[in-house]
Amino acid sequence: MFQKQILDWYQKDGRKDLPWQKNINPYRVWVSEVMLQQTQVSTVLPYYKKFMSSFPTIQKLAAAPQDIVMQHWSGLGYYSRARNLHRTAKYLTDNSDGIFPNEIDELMKLPGIGKTTAGAIKSLGFNQRGPILDGNVKRVLSRYHMIKGWYGNSKTNDELWFYAEKHTPFTSIREYTQAIMDIGATVCKKNNPKCSSCP
């Protein structure tokens, strides 16, 4: 029931025109997910477009000098994200012809990729089942299941991961993942949530 409500909402109201939703592949998803860490979509959009214009493939990113990569990141903040992108691009290009692994554990061995980013690459990039738990999803799940407690608390976080795993479907994976993030970003907002629009 939860998944159906989320997917029905997405078909009607979800965001489907973001640049990383076009020509989908693990590389494009990975860059977008790293840029979106701690950063709003509206801020990321121009950076993503410029970054992809200069580095349309992981091989192009790997071959670029680090200072050029950092110039493309200038203004986005959290600069270790850009350094990790470059390191991972070089590693994958050197060791696997630029091909991403599609298993969570293997993805998490790469610089700057945690459990949620790995889940996003798997679900959005490969369209394979991979739960995610970013800030938006935490908010949706904690309100839906009435989970109290600080997200940084390990018990609270474990409970949220339990529900993230439980609710992630085996079909329509890419759509569900995008949908639950969208609901958290546009409806179940931190401040002034639009509860009347909640599916």
Question: PLM ranges: what are they?
Answer:
Residues 199:
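Cys/His-coordinated zinc-binding microdomains
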Residues 2-196:
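Catalytic cores of DNA base-excision repair glycosylases
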